[in-house]
């Protein structure tokens, strides 16, 4: 507050400011620059594709994308969480990897995008397995809440949840999914004992102000206030379940509050860890 008050005496305008740790402020500065560099690289990649392909005006393509003021140019997809999913996005990036090679662009941004998606899922799986290891000889089961590629749908193609699950199963850990829309419900003996939960789905974040129009959304209140509603928000179906004492909840959306007798881990928030 003292620093803010000091700068207010010398600023001639009323700038927006963010209060954070030294590390957070430095990240804001350098990642701001990186976002610009990435944006320029993507736009100029379209220009290169136009030159190589022979029937494209890059200006027409980029002007159309510039008008996408909700998903591309707006604040959407600026919430760190689960990886990109669905049948379309990963598929198109894989196809564009072939295009980059076929047109001999000389570089492959799409490969970097898909590689980062894989490694990010693997990193999350490792964190879950670390949390699950109670003793050298015993690990808690891992339950991924949300198997479909997004909440409230039955479609599994391109699911980032299943990509995380793939690395958990590959390492030999016990894994279950909880998603009524894909007909996946863990056995009662799993739900009635401590486990590690990944809250992969959060309908409120995925759908935002359109949530009320989504079929299948439970019409009750969904404020995350205790373990019942925390899991209800993640599953999106109104099921009243509790986390058994001794369980661990990893929330990549950082919305779950402190829960009695349950360890809550906000993935991506490491303040105070050092």
Report the location of each language-model feature.
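Structural/interface elements that position substrates and couple domains in central-metabolism enzymes
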Residues: 1-274
């Amino acid at each position: 507050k003292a620093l803010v008050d000091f700068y207010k005496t010398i600023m001639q305008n009323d700038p927006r400011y963010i209060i954070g740790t030294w590390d957070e402020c430095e990240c804001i500065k350098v990642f701001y620059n990186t976002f610009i560099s990435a944006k320029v690289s993507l736009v100029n990649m379209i220009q290169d594709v136009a030159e190589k392909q022979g029937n494209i005006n890059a200006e027409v393509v980029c002007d159309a994308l510039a008008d996408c003021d909700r998903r591309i140019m707006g604040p959407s997809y600026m919430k760190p969480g689960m990886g990109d999913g669905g049948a379309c996005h990963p598929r198109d990036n894989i196809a564009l990897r072939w295009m980059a090679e076929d047109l001999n662009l000389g570089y492959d941004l799409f490969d970097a995008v898909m590689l980062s998606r894989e490694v990010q899922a693997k990193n999350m799986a490792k964190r879950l397995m670390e949390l699950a290891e109670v003793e050298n000889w015993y690990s808690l089961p891992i339950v991924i809440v949300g198997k479909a590629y997004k909440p409230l749908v039955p479609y599994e193609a391109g699911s980032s949840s299943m990509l995380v699950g793939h690395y958990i199963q590959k390492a030999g850990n016990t894994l279950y999914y909880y998603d009524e829309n894909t007909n996946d419900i863990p056995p009662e003996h799993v739900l009635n004992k401590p486990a590690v939960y990944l809250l992969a789905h959060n309908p409120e974040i995925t759908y935002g102000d359109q949530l009320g129009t989504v079929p299948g959304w439970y019409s009750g209140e969904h404020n995350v206030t205790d373990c019942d509603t925390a899991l209800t928000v993640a599953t999106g179906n109104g099921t009243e379940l509790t986390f058994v004492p001794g369980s661990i909840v990893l929330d990549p959306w950082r919305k779950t509050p402190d829960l009695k007798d349950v360890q809550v881990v906000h993935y991506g928030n490491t303040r105070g860890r050092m």
